[in-house]
Amino acid sequence: VAVSADPNEPNVIVTRLTLVCSTAPGPLELDLTGDLESFKIKISFRYIQHTYRKGVKIDKTDYMVGSYGPRAEEYEFLTPMEEAPKGMLARFTDDDKTDHLSGERNLTIKK
């Protein structure tokens, strides 16, 4: 990624979003440098994840990603590993024996 010293350029340029799951075949990587018409992404320096069970919020995880000074190399932030909820209602295979964990992923990033 080329680094620009133009004062008219934005201070922060987000070039990539990568989602990592230890049981997935590989990371899901979104290139944010090309045509972004199909993406609706809001970038902030805070990562918040809500966990719901039967429509009720049971957990909220909040990470401060940080503040970074300018440099030529890209910065990388990796959140700590998280464990999915356990129990009868928290499963990846439903009553019809459909395995949701190994299927195609859908990602919704919204406010």
Swiss-Prot record:
Keyword Thylakoid set for record: no
Covalent cross-link (Glycyl lysine isopeptide (Lys-Gly) (interchain with G-Cter in SUMO2)), residues: 57, 60
PTM annotation (N6-succinyllysine): residues: 60
Intracellular or extracellular location(s): Cytoplasm
An example Gene Ontology molecular-function term: Rho GDP-dissociation inhibitor activity
Cross-link (Glycyl lysine isopeptide (Lys-Gly) (interchain with G-Cter in SUMO1)): 57, 60
Post-translational events: The N-terminus is blocked.
UniProt-listed Pfam families: Rho_GDI
Any one GO biological process: Rho protein signal transduction
Cellular component terms (Gene Ontology): cytosol; membrane
Keywords tagged on the record: Acetylation, Cytoplasm, GTPase activation, Isopeptide bond, Ubl conjugation
Stored InterPro entries: Ig_E-set, Rho_GDI, RhoGDI_dom_sf
Keyword Ubl conjugation: yes
Superkingdom of origin organism: Eukaryota
Residues recorded with modification N6-acetyllysine: 60
PANTHER family in the record: RHO GDP-DISSOCIATION INHIBITOR (PTHR10980), RHO GDP-DISSOCIATION INHIBITOR 1 (PTHR10980:SF9)
Quaternary organization: Monomer. Interacts with FER. Interacts with PLXNB3. Forms a heterodimer with RAC1. Interacts with RHOA, the affinity is increased by three orders of magnitude when RHOA is prenylated. Interacts with PSMD10; the interaction increases ARHGDIA association with RHOA, leading to ARHGDIA-mediated inactivation of RHOA and ROCK and prolonged AKT activation. Interacts with KANK2; the interaction is direct and may regulate the interaction of ARHGDIA with RHOA, RAC1 and CDC42. Interacts with RHOC. Interacts with CDC42. Interacts with NGFR (via death domain); NGFR binding decreases the affinity for RHOA.
Family as reported in the entry's similarity comment: Belongs to the Rho GDI family.
Biological role stated in the UniProt entry: Controls Rho proteins homeostasis. Regulates the GDP/GTP exchange reaction of the Rho proteins by inhibiting the dissociation of GDP from them, and the subsequent binding of GTP to them. Retains Rho proteins such as CDC42, RAC1 and RHOA in an inactive cytosolic pool, regulating their stability and protecting them from degradation. Actively involved in the recycling and distribution of activated Rho GTPases in the cell, mediates extraction from membranes of both inactive and activated molecules due its exceptionally high affinity for prenylated forms.
Protein name according to UniProt: Rho GDP-dissociation inhibitor 1
Species of origin: Cavia porcellus
Classification lineage: Eukaryota, Metazoa, Chordata, Craniata, Vertebrata
Gene: ARHGDIA
